[in-house]
Structure formats: C-alpha cells, structure tokens
C-alpha cells in the first residue's frame, strides 16, 4: 500500500483537519464512529482509501493522522465533536500553554517539550503502514505553533524518515486581514527553516478564500467553517488520486516530479473550480471547457497573485467526476491557443492531467453545490514570488525598527536568525526571477547553482 500520514499542527491545521476528515468520511461512506456499513462498499470493494485510513480488528476505520496543538482548546473541540469516536485519543496531542503567536516558543521553548511525544505517535502510525509514501502537513505560517512547531517537526521528520515525501498545506497570512501583528516574522522564519525539508508546499491565503466565499457562494460574512470546507474540497481533490482508483493515478512523488523543476521552487498555486452555490448550480450545468477556463481566472486562485505577470513552469489538472480525456484535451488545446498563458521557454509542454471518476462529494448543509465534475489546478508559476515579496516588505518595515524582536530573543533565539531567514527569502525571490528569465538572456545556468 502507499499510505500517507496527515499531521495537523496548530489551530489552523487542526480546523482544516476537521473539515478534511469530515469530507473523507463522507466520500468513503465511513460513519463518524469509524464503522463502514457493509452494504455501502463504495464502488464494489475499492480499497484505495486505506492509504488514509487504517482498519482495526473490530472493523473500525481510523484516520492515519495526528492532531497537535500547544494549547488544548481547539483540539478539545475534536475530542468532544461529532467525530470524537473516529480518532484514537493518543492521536490528539495537546500541550498546556500556547505559543502565543511566537515562532521561538513553538520552535524552541514550548515545542521542544512535546515534539518527542508527537514523533513517537507518528512512529506508531508509520509502523502500521506497509509502504509509507509520505506526510501531509497542515499548518499556518502566521501562528506560533503553526510556524515554529511545524518547522521543528519537519526537521525531525527529515532525520527519522529521510527519503519520504513531505507535502505542506500552509495558510499564508492574508494581505489585508491579519490575525497577528508578527505574522511576517513567523512566516519568514518558518519558510526559511522548512524550505529544505519540504518537497512541495500548497499555499492557501485566507483573504483569497474569503473573496471566493463572498463572490461565488454569496456568503456575506464567511466564517472559518466556510473557509475550511472550501479548503477541504481542495485538499480532497489533490488527494483523491491517492484515495480512489483513477484513470491516471497520481501519487505523492508524481506531484513533485511534475511540479517542482528545482528543489527550492516548490510552491504551486492552487485553483479550484467550480465553486458555486446550490441556487446557482440549479440553473447551470458546467462543462469541462468551462471549469477548465475558470482555473485560469485569478479570482479562483487560493493565493492572491497575478499569474498574468508571471510565467508557468508546469501545470497539473486534476479532474474528478464525469470527465473524459477527449473533452479535457479539447479544453486545454483551446486554452493554449487563445489564452495569454506564458510558459517559460525551457518547459514547452507543461500540462499534466489526472482524472478520477468519483464525482466531488459535498458536506450536507454546506455551502457548495453538488456538481457532476470539478477540477483542481496546481500550477507552478513565477507569479507566486509576488506573495513572498509582499511578506518580505512587511518583515522589513518591522525589522528595520527591531519591533517585537525582544519577544523572540527572550525565548532563546538569536537576532542573527532573523537576518539569515530574510536573506534566504531574498534568495528565493531571486531564484524565481531567474527561473522566469528566458534561457537566452543572461547565463541560463544561474538557477542550477544553489
């Protein structure tokens, strides 16, 4: 088997985890207590879902997941929620005091105390796997636990499981809406530390998702539940190929092979379509061409950047539902001809397609309409550098005055770590710039030398 272990860190990671596992259970016909009614064997005995669930002797399906937070309130909601019986109590790990939005607390002082317990639990999950293929790590960049503890955990996972893939789903601090003043510090410190340990990182920007909820789903004031259910759909699309038999089965390593041209350039942009409310869907049926087109609308992206300013290096289209290759090829051909999509000149083909015949499932009482087909596009574009530039600028404004730095130094960090992290991100921006250059101008060798 090709199992994946999901690790949900901090408030954002745990709440996205709730949305994802709720959706996985619905997709696979698993009840909140982990039982799978025998009459509901989906698709006549397709056991691909075992990549995400392990089965106990009593016939209960348990998620291969760990929920970690340095303070208990958010995980307590899982412990008392609808899905409390789904998880083994030891999978839900909490500390006593939180990281207080401070990377240094998550990475050094508070995180250190809990990391061995977490690794021990992950080891137990890994031992149940016959062929572990990697880890999916869910966290935010802005929080103290999400940034600090995640980077600590990634470093330790690299030591213990060197060859296994590690994919991140990270919540990027929204340009306008902020939950903490020190988000830019935490984001840059965590990006610097995890850059060499992460194989592929899908970023999600709260503000972009707010806008999608407001515009496409007509929700006036979206709550985190609305946002997380949408993120859950996206994560589900990305992992569907691991959990169902598809025509073109994509596994974790295959993502990287096709999306990551250089080790550091591993931040694909995620776009999902159709995001549509039930009232609207009632009146329209979306064709493959329409949803494919929608993927190239900046409005449907999960991070606010403008791909028209960048160049594409690779594109992965993951379709699910009633989709045939003929329609997909036609849709992509049309896009190639009429769209203003620029590919870098050293990567001419650039489209990889995966199809899963399982149509998207929706959460009952949720906001999304039930649709026949959906697509999730993962594209590696140089435009994502805009997101880094934005963050770096905010970092610079604060760091020039050394604002808030004493909180980090007080927890045992050195000021040098800030400048080191900042330099690494400057290098990352430069890497993106070089990758986007045509092979003709300058020395095309720049990107290969790290």
From Swiss-Prot:
Active-site residues annotated for this sequence: 254
Cofactor(s) demanded: Mg(2+)
GO molecular function: GTP binding; hydrolase activity; metal ion binding; myosin binding; structural constituent of cytoskeleton
Pfam families: Tubulin (PF00091), Tubulin_C (PF03953)
InterPro entries tied to this protein: Alpha_tubulin (IPR002452), Tub_FtsZ_C (IPR008280), Tubulin (IPR000217), Tubulin/FtsZ-like_C (IPR037103), Tubulin/FtsZ_2-layer-sand-dom (IPR018316), Tubulin/FtsZ_GTPase_sf (IPR036525), Tubulin_C (IPR023123), Tubulin_CS (IPR017975)
Binding site for Mg(2+): 71
Site entry (Involved in polymerization), positions: 450
Entry's Gene Ontology BP terms: microtubule cytoskeleton organization; mitotic cell cycle; sperm axoneme assembly; spermatogenesis
UniProt-listed Enzyme Commission number(s): 3.6.5.-
Entry keywords, A to Z: Acetylation, Cytoplasm, Cytoskeleton, GTP-binding, Hydrolase, Magnesium, Metal-binding, Microtubule, Nucleotide-binding
Name of this chain's protein: Tubulin alpha-3 chain
Native source species: Drosophila melanogaster
Gene field: alphaTub84D
């Amino acid at each position: 088997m090709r199992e994946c272990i999901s690790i949900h860190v901090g408030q954002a990671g745990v709440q996205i985890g709730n949305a994802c596992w709720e959706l996985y259970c619905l997709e696979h016909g698993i009840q909140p207590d982990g039982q799978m009614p025998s009459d509901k064997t989906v698709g006549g005995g397709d056991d691909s879902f075992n990549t995400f669930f392990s089965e106990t002797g009593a016939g209960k399906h348990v998620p291969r997941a760990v929920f970690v937070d340095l303070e208990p309130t958010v995980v307590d909601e899982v412990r008392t929620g609808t899905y409390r019986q789904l998880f083994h109590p030891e999978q839900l790990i909490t500390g006593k005091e939180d990281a207080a939005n401070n990377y240094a607390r998550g990475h050094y002082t508070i995180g250190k105390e809990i990391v061995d317990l977490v690794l021990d639990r992950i080891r137990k999950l890994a031992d149940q796997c016959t062929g572990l293929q990697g880890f999916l790590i869910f966290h935010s960049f802005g929080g103290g636990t999400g940034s600090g503890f995640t980077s600590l955990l990634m470093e330790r996972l690299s030591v213990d499981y060197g060859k296994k893939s590690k994919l991140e789903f990270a919540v990027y601090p929204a340009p306008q809406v902020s939950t903490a003043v020190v988000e830019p510090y935490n984001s840059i410190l965590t990006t610097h530390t995890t850059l060499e340990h992460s194989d592929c990182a899908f970023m999600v920007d709260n503000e972009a998702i707010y806008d999608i909820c407001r515009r496409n789903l007509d929700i006036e004031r979206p709550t985190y539940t609305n946002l997380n259910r949408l993120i859950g759909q996206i994560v589900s699309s990305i992992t569907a190929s691991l959990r169902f038999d598809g025509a073109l089965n994509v596994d974790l390593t295959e993502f990287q092979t096709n999306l990551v041209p250089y080790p550091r350039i591993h931040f694909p942009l995620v776009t999902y379509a159709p995001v549509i409310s039930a009232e609207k869907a009632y009146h329209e049926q979306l064709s493959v061409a329409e949803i494919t087109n929608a993927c190239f609308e900046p409005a449907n992206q999960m991070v606010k950047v403008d791909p028209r300013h960048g160049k594409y290096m690779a594109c992965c289209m993951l379709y699910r539902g009633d989709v045939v290759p003929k329609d997909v090829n036609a849709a992509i051909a049309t896009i190639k001809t009429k769209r203003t999509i620029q590919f870098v000149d050293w990567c001419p083909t650039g489209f990889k397609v995966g199809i899963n015949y399982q149509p998207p499932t929706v959460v009952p009482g949720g906001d999304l309409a039930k649709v026949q087909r959906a697509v999730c596009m993962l594209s590696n574009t140089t435009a994502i550098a805009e997101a880094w530039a934005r963050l770096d600028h905010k970092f610079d404004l604060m760091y020039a005055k050394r604002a808030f730095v004493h909180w980090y130094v007080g927890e045992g960090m050195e000021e040098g770590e800030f400048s080191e992290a900042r330099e690494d991100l400057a290098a990352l921006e430069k890497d993106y710039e070089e990758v986007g250059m045509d092979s003709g101008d300058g020395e095309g060798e720049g990107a290969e030398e790290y």
